[in-house]
A protein has these predicted regions:
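Short beta-strand/loop segment that forms part of the nucleotide-sugar
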Residues: 7, 20, 28-38, 54
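Short, well-formed alpha-helical segments that are part of the catalytic scaffolds
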Residues: 11-25
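Short beta-strand-to-loop acidic/aromatic patch adjacent to the donor-nucleotide binding site
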Residues: 76-90
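A conserved acidic beta->alpha catalytic loop
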Residues: 35-43, 89
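Acidic helix N-cap motif at the loop->helix transition within catalytic regions
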Residues: 14-18, 40-49
Length: 227
């Protein structure tokens, strides 16, 4: 099975290399970092760590993910599975094998790394993040009958299934769009507990009041948009 990784990155010069080097290289064909308008050494450090680096000038988490997907889709041999992980080193890259295993062994089409079901370092998620995740997953359960406990970015999905989702969101609604569409298309989804720690540096989303409010609004908007 061919497995590639997409890592969206915005000003993560201190963390991105750590993420790349900690991933299980023996399981992966290519690690793709999508630099999303960083003003620091994210590109330089990601390249030095051995990743392929793409540039996405349109600001937004979803834009970065879509750029990576387009790159993999255009390859002579696209991947069977794509793994997503953030560039901030808050997730444990070595746990990628846990997320990939259900797909590799044919039990699932998509796997979400659940911080809610795993071990969270104290202070790794803010109170608004915890409440927002609870609210979003509760709405997913009520509206879509979807049994998720988290919207965490650490996840894997069969590439053909990902393309069939026709992902559209360009900012903060990316993860919830993937999960609700996967439910609508009756993909076999599984969650695995993951370890979550304080990120390297300050979050560009939860680290500011504006970022938290914008992310929360977009997630709720996306949930109701497809209902």
């Amino acid at each position: 099975m061919i497995i590639d990784v997409i890592i969206p990155a915005y000003n993560e010069q201190d963390a991105v290399g750590k993420v790349i080097r900690a991933l299980p290289e023996n399981m992966l064909r290519e690690i793709v970092v999508v630099n999303n308008n960083s003003s620091d050494a994210t590109t330089t450090n990601a390249t030095a760590a051995g990743a392929t680096v793409l540039q996405e000038t349109r600001q937004g988490y979803g834009f970065a993910c879509l750029k990576g997907i387009g790159y993999l889709k255009a390859k002579a041999t696209p991947p069977d599975i794509v793994l997503f992980i953030d560039a901030d080193f808050s997730d444990q890259p070595r746990e990628a094998a846990l997320i990939l295993e259900p797909i590799i062994n044919g039990r699932a089409d998509m796997v979400i790394g659940s911080r809610a079901a795993g071990n969270k370092e104290k202070g790794s998620m803010t109170i608004p993040q915890v409440f927002g995740t609870w609210l979003a997953t509760t709405l997913l359960r009520i509206i879509y009958k979807a049994s998720f406990t988290d919207l965490g970015p650490f996840r894997a999905i069969k590439f053909c299934k990902l393309l069939a989702l026709n992902m559209q969101d360009t900012t903060f609604g990316w993860t919830v769009e993937m999960q609700l569409k996967a439910t609508q298309q009756k993909l076999v989804c599984e969650e695995v507990p993951v370890t979550y720690r304080k990120r390297v540096g300050v979050s560009k989303i939860s680290g500011t009041v504006k970022g938290t409010l914008m992310a929360g609004y977009k997630i709720l908007y996306t949930i109701f948009k497809y209902s």
